[in-house]
Curated annotation (Swiss-Prot):
Participates in at least several B-cell activation processes as well as of other cell types. It is a costimulator of DNA-synthesis. It induces the expression of class II MHC molecules on resting B-cells. It enhances both secretion and cell surface expression of IgE and IgG1. It also regulates the expression of the low affinity Fc receptor for IgE (CD23) on both lymphocytes and monocytes. Positively regulates IL31RA expression in macrophages. Stimulates autophagy in dendritic cells by interfering with mTORC1 signaling and through the induction of RUFY4. It comes from the Eukaryota. Glycans are attached at N28, N45, N62, N84, N96, N102. One of its GO terms (cellular component) is extracellular space. The keyword Cytoplasm does not apply. GO terms for molecular function: cytokine activity; growth factor activity; interleukin-4 receptor binding. It comes from Felis catus. Residues 1-24 form the signal peptide. SMART domains: IL4_13. GO terms for biological process: B cell activation; immune response; interleukin-4-mediated signaling pathway; negative regulation of inflammatory response; positive regulation of DNA-templated transcription; positive regulation of macroautophagy; regulation of immune response. It is found in: Secreted. This is Interleukin-4.
């Protein structure tokens, strides 16, 4: 019995370490998938890339990544629900970004940009984030 009580703290620490490791791996895999999808989308030269979207990536410096990703998912949803544009890729991008974002956020941007510019800037943000991990 004494050995069991001695093993419990060690097992708890081991469990905590492995869950942190798995979470880190999932995060890196999500970032890779987002960047891959953005590479595919930004390589396209169809008319959808010229659509005007809210420039939510031009947020103040003190805006958290989770808030920026939440706003980006809002823009993506508006595109694929109102336009028949690369829906499969935009939905996948939305799903992956949502896993890294706040659940709710407000989007009231006045500035606009093209979808292509939006996706290019989002790709740069994600590549920078990936290089830090």
């Amino acid at each position: 019995m004494g050995l069991t009580y001695q093993l419990i703290p060690a097992l708890v620490c081991l469990l905590a370490f492995t869950s942190t490791f798995v979470h880190g791996q999932n995060f890196n895999n999500t970032l890779k998938e987002i960047i891959k999808t953005l590479n595919i989308l930004t390589a396209r030269n169809d008319s959808c890339m010229e659509l005007t979207v809210m420039d939510v990536l031009a947020a103040p410096k003190n805006t958290s990544d989770k808030e920026i990703f939440c706003r980006a998912t809002t823009v993506l949803r508006q595109i694929y629900t109102h336009h028949n544009c690369s829906t499969k890729f935009l939905k996948g991008l939305d799903r992956n970004l949502s896993s890294m974002a706040n659940r709710t956020c407000s989007v009231n941007e006045v500035k606009k940009c093209t979808l292509k510019d939006f996706l290019e800037r989002l790709k740069a943000i994600m590549q920078k984030k990936y290089s830090k991990h």
